[in-house]
Amino acid sequence: FRSGGAVLAYLLYGNLFTEYETAHNMVRGSVDSLYLASIFSTYPAAALSVWQAAGVEIVITSILMGLIMALTDDGNGVPKGALAPLLIGILVAVIGASTGPLTGFAMNPARDFGPKLFAWMAGWGDIAMTGGRDIPYFIVPIIAPLIGACAGAAIYKYLIGKNLPC
């Protein structure tokens, strides 16, 4: 569905992208055009190395997974009901507000790769996949969240979950 959202946004606002590119002498597919491509998917801040961006994604995804497990674990005494989804939503908003400027907080490969692929097809070309880096940056939002989710689950299971009474 994320790719569908990217397609819909492009269909609705494509002429505005073209106007912006013309007004700012921007060539689609250049490093400068990442500003517009980032509407569809995530790219790291220019000051971050690829390893730093991967580290950010691993940490924020592990925090998200650990807290999701804590909020949904039947053995920890947290009241169930509508509170867990609300708290998870607040957590995602806090993560986004605090780390969004660093990497765009992908936290989910599906949230990033499909829209990147669409941006590639819509004329941004290789810059959509590399993010202006020497390596294919699209790999980071695929692999780092997987590592982070596994790490968050393992940390919860072995440090917290094993001490719960159930």
Q: Where does each model-flagged region fall?
A:
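Membrane-interface helix-loop junctions and terminal tails of multi-pass membrane proteins
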Residues: 1-166
